[in-house]
Structures are given as C-alpha cells and as structure tokens.
Amino acid sequence: METQRASLCLGRWSLWLLLLALVVPSASAQALSYREAVLRAVDRLNEQSSEANLYRLLELDQPPKADEDPGTPKPVSFTVKETVCPRPTRQPPELCDFKENGRVKQCVGTVTLDQIKDPLDITCNEVQGVRGGGLCYCRRRFCVCVGRG
C-alpha cells in the first residue's frame, strides 16, 4: 500500500515537472543569435523608415566576445543596402534583390539577444558618395573609397 502511494506521488511530481517544462520556455529558446538580433534591427529600420524601398543586410561585423546574459546590450555594427522592393509590400528583405546604385547605410548601436526584452538602439547614416560616382565604406575609423573617375 505504501509503495503504491509513493509511486502515485512520484507520478504526480513527474507530471508537474513535465507541465512546467512545457509552460516555461527555456532560456536558450528565448535567446536570439547575434545575426538574428541584427536582422530584427534591420526589420525595425524598415518599419520606421519613410523611404520608398526596403533595406537588406549587406555586411555584418564580427560579433562581440561571448556574453552569457542575453539581456545585456551588445555592441553591433553592420551595413545595409537599398533593395528593389517597395516598403509597402511587406516582403521579407532577404527575398529582395539589391537595387543597382541603391543607398548604402552604415549602422551602429546595441542589441540584445533576448526575444522578450526588445531594446534596440541603432543609428544608421548614409554612406557618402565621392567624386566620380564612387562610394566610401567606413568601418570604425578606417574608410575605403572606390571611385569611377
């Protein structure tokens, strides 16, 4: 009788633990990868933009050193380029081709890898053209300019 009662109690605890595991998502399921967090920032940029076309990730700088806390803001630097897709279409930017001679923006700021917390602090500035119709790409304090003339 005592063994049967202990078995029933153990069964209930197992059921409770299983239900708890299903209801409470794990921390790893809530954490985004560095790239996913940046893509989310690009989506936010497109949502808040008043420009005609969507922007798509062109280049992503290396992620910062590993930090175990997904809620801690992480520095980010990336480049986006204008696509051929009009903003009102709501098409995923990853499916859009880059626009020939489209605008290029360098973006810096911070993101978190936590899906629940959503603080993004990103500033994007258009990469300025140079004489002859070329472009300058600046990364931190180093710029490379490619001109046509």
Curated annotation (Swiss-Prot):
Primary location class: secreted
Modification type Arginine amide: residues: 148
Positions of disulphide bridges: 85-96, 107-124, 136-145, 138-143
Source species, domain of life: Eukaryota
Example GO BP: innate immune response
Signal sequence, start to end: 1-29
Region annotated Disordered, chain positions: 61-80
Keywords assigned by UniProt, alphabetized: Amidation, Antibiotic, Antimicrobial, Disulfide bond, Secreted, Signal
Short name of any one Pfam family annotated for the protein: Cathelicidins
Residue span(s) of the pro-peptide: 30-130
Family named by the database record: Belongs to the cathelicidin family.
The protein, known as: Protegrin-3
Source organism: Sus scrofa (Pig)
Organismal lineage: Eukaryota, Metazoa, Chordata, Craniata, Vertebrata
